[in-house]
């Protein structure tokens, strides 16, 4: 005779801690990988010329993030479909703007765009997990609005890409938070196009207010879509209004409920 299957409640009690541990180990691996690279970046920063340091720094950050997504994919706990971003990989002078549902949004976009820079809080420049690598990659600090715009324009003129989340923080109100104008100002000053990117998910995981220790429904699914390409603007306020309306109409939340 075969033994009866364990009741659903018992299976959940057994499975839940394993799933929680697996997810935490993946996040821990991302952090440890970042810490290890930042130790190397700290040594390379004073030795490498600016252009070479920028290229190596960005490529290594993208590589580390791709490793995270590869492991997450094998675990089948987090499923990411971001292949469409590969079409942008080699473009020069491009601003990529996206909605911001999760703490992992920059990780999923930068993993596919090794020439891209992000704008980071000035305080993060001294974070041991992020600071040395970000400085080597010449990520852009937001010490001041004027300095941030000037550095971003210079980076774009040198062939870089810029990843921005115009909501400024993770989404807290449906469909999107009000957009900040920085991306539009930079696009006008640099006269570069703006590529809209949608991140679709039904999962609340690592959204605003979601604690790291809390296990969400699994699997967690993220799908990245390419949206419209906006031409270099003459009027940054008009571009801001147009892009915000476009995202408000195009964001898909709850599309992957199962």
Q: What residues fall within each predicted segment?
A:
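Catalytic core of membrane glycerolipid acyltransferases/transacylases, capturing the structured
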Residues: 38-66, 74-75, 90-144
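Short gly/ser/thr-rich secondary-structure transition/capping motifs
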Residues: 75-83, 142-146, 206-209
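Hydrophobic beta-strand scaffold residues
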Residues: 79-80, 141, 162, 194
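Non-catalytic C-terminal accessory region of glycerolipid acyltransferases
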Residues: 2-10, 20, 24, 146-258
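Membrane-anchoring hydrophobic helices of lipid-metabolizing enzymes
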Residues: 2-94
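Structural alpha-helical scaffold elements that stabilize or flank donor/cofactor-binding regions
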Residues: 88-89, 133-134, 155, 186
């Amino acid at each position: 005779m075969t033994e009866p299957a364990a009741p659903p409640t018992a299976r959940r009690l057994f499975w839940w801690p394993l799933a929680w541990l697996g997810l935490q180990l993946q996040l821990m691996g991302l952090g440890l990988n970042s810490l290890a690279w930042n130790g190397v970046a700290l040594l390379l920063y004073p030795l490498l010329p600016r252009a070479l340091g920028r290229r190596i720094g960005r490529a290594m950050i993208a590589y580390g993030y791709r490793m995270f997504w590869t492991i997450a994919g094998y675990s089948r706990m987090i499923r990411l479909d971001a292949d469409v971003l590969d079409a942008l990989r080699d473009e020069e002078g491009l601003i990529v703007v996206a909605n911001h549902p999760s703490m992992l949004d920059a990780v999923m976009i930068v993993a596919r765009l090794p020439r891209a820079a992000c704008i980071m809080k000035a305080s993060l420049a001294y974070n041991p997990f992020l600071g040395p690598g970000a400085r080597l990659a010449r990520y852009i600090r937001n010490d001041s609005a004027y300095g941030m715009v000037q550095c971003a324009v210079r980076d774009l003129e040198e062939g870089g890409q810029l990843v921005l989340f115009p909501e400024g923080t993770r989404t807290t109100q449906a469909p999107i938070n009000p957009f900040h104008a920085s991306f539009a100002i930079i696009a006008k000053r640099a006269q570069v196009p703006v590529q809209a990117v949608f991140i679709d998910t039904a999962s609340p995981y690592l959204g605003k207010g979601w604690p790291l220790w809390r296990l969400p429904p699994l699997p967690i699914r993220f799908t990245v879509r390419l949206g419209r390409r906006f031409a270099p603007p003459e009027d940054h306020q008009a571009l801001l209004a147009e892009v915000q309306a476009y995202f408000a109409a195009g964001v898909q939340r709850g599309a992957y409920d199962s």
